[in-house]
């Protein structure tokens, strides 16, 4: 059995990450990770008439870029696993409709990309696929409209309010690759911390990701593990 413990899976043959792609908005381009993004947008609408259409276009461009960088063609991709924050995952569904690839829609909020990597790796390790395209997206303006208030209302936001990323990350997973590899995954459980502050949505992730990290027998994440361990006990 490949399952290890209650939440983890060990892959018999590590799954390779063949390529990655990322497209982000102008605000993300002002941050310390700017040099690592493939494309930084200057127009948040991407020439479209709505934020939702802009996000769909963002998804399309990012996923196509990941496939292009992999050296494969869309015909070589067995499945797409992607998700976003919008109703019916329209960012993903409209974004990939022209790719003509079997699609699994995911809705895991901030965990969507990790969820896609884990499930994609399971498909490959189980010999159900050779190549899997994954993605996750969000758009600040579309998310504000979905979860808080449309920007057009001019509603005041606290300076400490969580700011949703405008961007899409994508990757191609493969059975045969040179690495890096996905060798194991740990799936989080639902932990309801009773957070009711709509301006602090990031804190909701803390309970689910914190427990697996703290219960690890070895510090796999280097400084990240140490920092998380420190704040967990404060």
Segment roles from a protein language model:
Residues 88-90, 140-145, 190-194:
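Short, well-ordered, mixed-charge alpha-helical segments that flank or form enzyme active sites
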Residues 33-36, 92-102, 124-126, 147-156:
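A glycine- and small-aliphatic-rich helix-loop capping segment at beta-alpha/alpha-beta transitions
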Residues 17, 52-111, 219-234:
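Conserved beta-ketoacyl condensing-enzyme motif
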Residues 1-52, 149-222, 226-227:
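Condensing-enzyme catalytic core mediating Claisen C-C bond formation in acyl metabolism
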Residues 107-134, 173:
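Active-site-proximal alpha-helical scaffold in enzymes
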Residues 18, 82-83, 132-138:
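Short beta-strand segments
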Residues 1-4, 64-69, 117-121, 155-156:
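Short alpha-helical segments and helix-capping/turn motifs at coil-helix boundaries
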Residues 24, 87, 139-140, 232:
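Residue-level marker for beta-strand->alpha-helix junctions and adjacent short loops that shape enzyme
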């Amino acid at each position: 059995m490949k399952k290890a413990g209650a939440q983890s899976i060990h892959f018999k043959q590590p799954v390779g990450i063949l390529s990655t792609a990322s497209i982000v908005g102008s605000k993300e381009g002002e941050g310390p990770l700017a040099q690592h993004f493939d494309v930084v947008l200057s127009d948040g609408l991407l020439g479209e008439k709505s934020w939702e259409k802009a996000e769909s276009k963002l998804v399309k461009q990012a996923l196509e870029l990941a496939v292009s960088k992999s050296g494969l063609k869309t015909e070589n991709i067995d499945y797409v696993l992607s998700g976003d924050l919008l109703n019916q995952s329209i960012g993903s569904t409209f974004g990939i409709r022209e790719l003509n690839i079997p699609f699994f829609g995911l809705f895991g909020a901030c965990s969507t990309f990790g969820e896609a990597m884990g499930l994609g790796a399971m498909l490959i390790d189980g010999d159900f696929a050779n190549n899997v395209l994954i993605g996750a997206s969000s758009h600040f303006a579309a998310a504000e409209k979905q979860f808080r208030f449309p920007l057009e209302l001019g509603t005041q936001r606290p300076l400490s309010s969580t700011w949703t990323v405008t961007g899409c990350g994508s990757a191609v997973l493969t059975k045969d690759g040179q690495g890096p590899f996905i060798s194991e995954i740990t799936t989080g459980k639902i932990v309801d911390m009773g957070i009711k502050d709509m301006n602090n949505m990031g804190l909701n992730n803390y309970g689910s990701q914190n427990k697996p990290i703290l219960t690890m027998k070895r510090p796999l994440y280097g400084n990240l593990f140490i920092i998380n361990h420190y704040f967990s006990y404060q």
